[in-house]
Amino acid sequence: MNQSLKLFAKGIEYIDKISLSVTGKHNIYNSLAAIAMCMLYNIDINFIKEGLSSYTGVGRRFEFLGKCNGAFVYDDYAHHPSEIKTTLDSVKKTKHNKDYAIFQSHTYSRTIQHLKEFADVLSNFDNIIIAPIYPAREENIWNVKESDLVDLIKEKNPNVIYLDSFDKIEKHIKNIVSENDLVITIGAGPVNEVAKNLVKE
């Protein structure tokens, strides 16, 4: 799950190699910014390396929670298409067999506003499970349904289903995932409870 980067600076051919305990391009960029600030203040490179290698990231950002049937289980707070694209990039750069994205859209208004964009990015996962929309106190005045998203995803990827409860999603995942698959819950609502329950046993 680790990644490494080599440090170069203007006028200097090579500084050092640093291992990160987190994945994703955004974490590389954040690490480079932190390194630049540390070097500006003449902090020893070994101290920088030690700090970055022990950093495990923030909660709910491509957070590894454990395993289910030998499959890696992650959670991510992403709830906007651009954030989901970043999550997708992290998933695809992580070594695994098949991936399963469990997506819960956050609010009816956001769902209707970004319906096509959600479908476009989610269709790039191997398998997609749509969870019930999280209303967050909103009334569904747009009459948007989970099936609207499923239908759009199906135009690009037939491996998508809607399950109307977290319990059904958990049972489905436990029946289909195996060693070295990757499962990720995506959304700002309580969908992360699915990931937590999957790794309990």
Label each residue range with its predicted role.
Residues 2-10:
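Short polybasic amphipathic segments
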Residues 11-127:
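Nucleotide phosphate-binding/pyrophosphate-handling subdomain across enzymes
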Residues 86, 113-115, 141-142, 174, ...:
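Short amphipathic alpha-helical segments
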Residues 102, 131, 185-186:
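Short hydrophobic segments within beta-strands
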Residues 105-108, 134-136, 188-191:
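Short glycine-rich anion-binding loops that position phosphate/pyrophosphate groups of nucleotides
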Residues 119-179:
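C-terminal helical cap/extension that packs against the catalytic core
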